[in-house]
């Protein structure tokens, strides 16, 4: 069984996630090769010593690889899996294919169709930034993060063990979920929070048309709450497109909570206080701060 320190890893996508992964794996595997279709990204990856070698073509990048990590947007991952599927002459014996996509159902379905010499494992690290690009790569990005692994029925124990080793090497902790459960939970905790931030920003922009002083009052609370609205639209469209039903269900649940709050504002103040205190207590329990006032 191949140990991580002997593995040759290819990372497709020299952006925030792929670049951060390459930095975090430095010295922990035999070799890392980057792949990116963008010439500027390839040059930056080499100039910044993010990877020692980089290719423009996926096929060239996996010639000697033991592990292929797809660190590209969801839509590109699906295209890359299709490309791997087309190469019926196996790209490499026992090539472990791990993706970092933010949705899993469509990706796992595409992985099922990979040739037999590919050994796929679905993945999704629950970390990132609202900014994209290799210039924001950080070796500590994955540290302390939950890293979802979604093995297929065809995933070998060796491939899953190697995926676990990658997760541990970058300082994350693995959580095994099936694709449908992942997509439902990610909709509630990641995808809908982005939409809520967009709605908050849109409502504020509309209100500022009548009174531009609004932006002078928008301090740290507003900035923190609306931060996700700065996320790449192209990336988020891929995510929303491949997770429509769970996102819609989670969005309707949020609307129900907003309606509830509107009703509490019109009713008994004691009931409103009870609701707010309950939510505050849950927040403190789930995400303990250093101190609360």
Residue ranges of model-derived segments:
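Rossmann-like NAD(P)(H) cofactor-binding subdomain of soluble oxidoreductases
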Residues: 79-135
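NAD(P)+-binding Rossmann beta1-loop-alpha1 motif at the extreme N-terminus of oxidoreductases
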Residues: 1-67
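Residues at the starts of beta-strands that form the adenosine-phosphate
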Residues: 8, 31, 119, 146, ...
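Glycine-rich, N-terminal phosphate-binding loop of Rossmann-like dinucleotide-binding domains
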Residues: 71-73, 101, 151
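Internal alpha-helical scaffold of NAD(P)-dependent oxidoreductase catalytic cores
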Residues: 141-227
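Interdomain hinge/lid region at the active-site interface
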Residues: 211-279
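N-terminal Rossmann-like NAD(P) cofactor-binding module of classical short-chain dehydrogenase/reductase
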Residues: 68-69, 98
């Amino acid at each position: 069984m191949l140990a991580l320190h002997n593995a040759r890893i290819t990372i497709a996508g020299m952006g925030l996630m792929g670049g951060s992964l390459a930095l975090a794996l430095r010295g922990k595997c035999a070799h890392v090769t980057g792949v990116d279709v963008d010439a500027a990204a390839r040059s930056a990856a080499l100039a910044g010593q993010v990877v020692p070698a980089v290719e423009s073509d996926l096929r060239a990048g996996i010639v000697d690889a033991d592990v292929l990590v797809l660190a590209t947007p969801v839509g590109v991952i699906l295209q890359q899996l299709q490309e791997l599927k087309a190469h019926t002459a196996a790209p490499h014996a026992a090539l472990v294919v791990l993706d970092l996509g933010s949705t899993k159902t469509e990706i796992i379905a595409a992985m099922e169709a990979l040739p037999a010499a590919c050994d796929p494992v679905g993945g999704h690290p629950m970390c990132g930034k609202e900014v994209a690009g290799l210039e924001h790569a950080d070796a500590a990005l994955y540290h302390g993060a939950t890293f979802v692994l979604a093995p297929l029925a065809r995933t070998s124990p060796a491939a899953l063990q190697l995926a676990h080793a990658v997760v541990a090497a970058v300082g994350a902790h693995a959580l095994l979920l099936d694709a449908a459960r992942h997509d439902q939970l990610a909709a509630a905790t990641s995808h809908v929070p982005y939409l809520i931030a967009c709605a908050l920003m849109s409502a504020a922009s509309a209100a500022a048309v009548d009174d531009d002083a609004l932006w002078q009052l928008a301090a740290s609370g507003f900035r923190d709450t609306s931060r996700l609205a700065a996320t790449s639209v192209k990336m988020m469209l891929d995510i929303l497109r491949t997770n429509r039903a769970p996102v819609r269900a989670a969005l309707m649940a949020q609307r129900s909570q907003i309606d509830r709050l509107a009703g509490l504002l019109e009713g008994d103040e004691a009931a409103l206080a009870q609701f707010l205190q309950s939510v505050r207590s849950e927040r403190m329990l789930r995400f303990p701060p250093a101190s609360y006032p």
